[in-house]
Amino acid sequence: ITGAEAMMRSLEHQGVTTIFGYPGGSIMPVFDALYDHQNTLNHILVRHEQGAAHAAQGFARVSGEVGVCLVTSGPGATNTITGIADAMIDSTPIVVIAGQVGTGFLGTDAFQEVDLVGITQPIAKWSYQIRRAEDVAWAVARAFYIARSGRPGPVVLDFAKDAQNAKTKYEPAKLDFIRSYVPVPDTDEDSVKEAAELINNAERPLVLVGQGVELGNAQSELRAFIEKADMPAGCTLLGLSALPTDHPLNKGMLGMHGNLGPNINTNKCDVLIAVGMRFDDRVTGNLATYAKQAKVIHFDIDPAEVNKNVKVDIAVLGDCKNTLAAVTGLLKENKHTEWNDSFKEYEKVEEEKVIRPELYPATDSLTMGEVARAVSEATHHEAVLVTDVGQNQMISARYFKYSKERSIITSGGLGTMGFGLPAAIGATFGAPERTVCVFMGDGGLQMNIQELGTIMEQKAPVKIICLNNNFLGNVRQWQAMFFNRRYSFTPMLNPDYMKIASAYDIPSKRVYSREELKVAIDEMLATDGPFLLEACVIEEGNVLPMTPPGGSVNQMLLEC
């Protein structure tokens, strides 16, 4: 068989069912082979290769499986770079298969030749160029093993065109060990005992829940861990659905636009327990003042994250599904009633100063928060929330509630505008049984708006909620707060989104009032297929609370 056919069989052997891609010259032999595998491999034709990468991310994040995208060389490959970088920083398992010029043309600046391996090595777990057809099965097995094992991430396969056409004998390859690669470090038993002892003696423990809990499918272990010791928990943006919002020990969201309680009490706890999170700057604020009073325990699968940003006292390395269970087995039944009650005063202040004005505003105009909460309630808090980046991201994350696992998909570390729409498409294929709602701003919607064509063709049931404030809202908020309201190129003149939706044969509705909003949400959710809901919200609405740039987590601003 050809190398291209070997690629198809190798993908099937890995359990792949869905591919997001865009054909072109240097990948045509693979697409020709794909023509005969349409019964087993569902190819989704995107409208831009960046959309393919983000769709693969959305598929992976909601399903826990490896997302796959297939593109051509040159601009096709470079168009995936943002998605690869996004997947790397957010630990998302995807495999990007790109065509490449024939081996005889490498290094000659041939048509649509780029050094994809060189470009992607810093932003991928592994980048490899396939130059021989006989290497296909091995390379694919290695790629999927690396992408999904340990701390997940993106892998790039650069597939030379002559290797696609060359003949080879195919044998399925299985790989579960690479000598130079240790995906899960050994857990030190002493660290488990020390962590348990420190927690047992803590008076004010606080657990920080990251996406690693979901990546490790450790949600039930997390609940057992915090419940046994009666420990309050705060969730990072990517970890929000690892613990149900209404769980009594869930104190809310961490970070720059998170909730007061878990942020301020980070600097009041005596033991800080981080689980599957990396202490990024959006969570810590000013590191010089971050949790200096606390002993720090860090559960993580990646040794590189330990002591990178925050000095830890005990590192518990390994898969958190196993390490949490091990530590929980050594914990004493405990109660921290007074400590848990201390969060209530912050909840009361935030409710009065921020939440009520956002959800029950005095103005007739819609706020971003009330739109998000209304959609969450209408879906019984069971929808998959996909967000773009900006105010829409922070506001929907704050006001959505999460009752199911793997319910938030967003660009966390890279902050990629244009992520939301294609990621939502991927999510509908990764979890077809669930309602997928994507919140976007009027800025981000236009960054990959061409993917409405993919939605139209696939009839993907994406529920698109555009929060239209005629601004690049997040940047405008910073300009208002820190740049004397000098709105430098943040006001936006927008197209008529209703006409755009109509052109793509997507039902749509524009709303200005609360009465219109309720009717439109009901119509959106009753529609079998995609729907675009444009909510015209207060133009200069802000996302609060907010940790100011360079500020500490206990210096959150409640007003602009």
Describe these PLM feature segments.
Residues 1-338, 378-381, 461-464, 501:
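N-terminal alpha/beta PP-like core and its mobile active-site loop of ThDP/TPP-dependent enzymes
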Residues 4-17, 25, 30-35, 347-427, ...:
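Active-site diphosphate/adenylate-binding microenvironment
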Residues 22-24, 43-54, 69-76, 131-133, ...:
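Active-site nucleophile and cofactor-binding loops and adjacent substrate-binding regions
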Residues 48-49, 108-110, 182-196, 254-258, ...:
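A general structural motif
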Residues 97, 106-112, 307-309, 315-317, ...:
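Thiamine diphosphate
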Residues 134, 197, 293-389, 514-523, ...:
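Phosphate/pyrophosphate-binding active-site segments
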Residues 156, 298, 386, 439-440:
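Generic enzyme active-site microenvironment
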Residues 210-214, 360, 441:
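Conserved short loop/turn motifs at secondary-structure junctions
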